[in-house]
Swiss-Prot record:
The keyword Heme does not apply. Pfam families: OSCP. F(1)F(0) ATP synthase produces ATP from ADP in the presence of a proton or sodium gradient. F-type ATPases consist of two structural domains, F(1) containing the extramembraneous catalytic core and F(0) containing the membrane proton channel, linked together by a central stalk and a peripheral stalk. During catalysis, ATP synthesis in the catalytic domain of F(1) is coupled via a rotary mechanism of the central stalk subunits to proton translocation. It is a peripheral membrane protein. This is ATP synthase subunit delta.
Length: 158
């Protein structure tokens, strides 16, 4: 089997499983009136995945069945992205970046990490200059504060 054939089969499986789960979640969220685990479970299709039933029971135990519509919305967004979680990142600068700088940094980082990258920009004047970029568990620190600390460490050890 070629890689492209495997990709087609995997996509069909993913679409089928997420479609079934989404249909069950929508049915659960459509219950009107008093929300009890029993009423919500009764609204589920017979072929609803066990995980959806377990979710309903867990939300019911915690008194959070009213959060089902938010879960449906989040699940719909995830399935539109193919199940991938959005990658989050933070760009910290010593001074406020202008819109052109933000756009350039965003373009470079999304080219490297993908279009689902969600960036947050903030300012930390103690950096003196440069940037700190955190994406996932990766950190790129080009700040003057860090460079000066490295120089100081080198001077102390020599």
């Amino acid at each position: 089997m070629s890689a492209s054939e495997a990709q087609v089969i995997a996509r069909a499986l993913f679409d089928s499983l997420t479609g079934t789960a989404l249909q069950a979640l929508r049915a659960a969220a459509s219950v009107n009136g008093e929300l009890t685990p029993e009423r919500v479970l009764a609204a589920l299709p017979e072929d609803a995945p066990r995980e959806i039933r377990n979710l309903v029971m867990a939300l019911g135990r915690e008194g959070n069945l009213d959060r089902l519509p938010a879960v449906v919305t989040a699940f719909e967004q995830m399935t539109r992205r193919g199940g991938a979680r959005p990658l989050t990142g933070e760009v910290i600068s010593a001074v406020e970046l202008n819109p052109q700088q933000r756009e350039r940094i965003t373009a470079q980082l999304t080219a490297r990490y993908g279009p689902d990258l969600e960036l947050r920009f903030s300012v930390d004047e103690s950096l003196i200059g440069g940037l700190i970029i955190r994406i996932g568990d990766q950190v790129l620190d080009t700040s003057l504060r860090t460079r000066m600390a490295a120089i100081q460490r080198n001077m102390m050890t020599s």
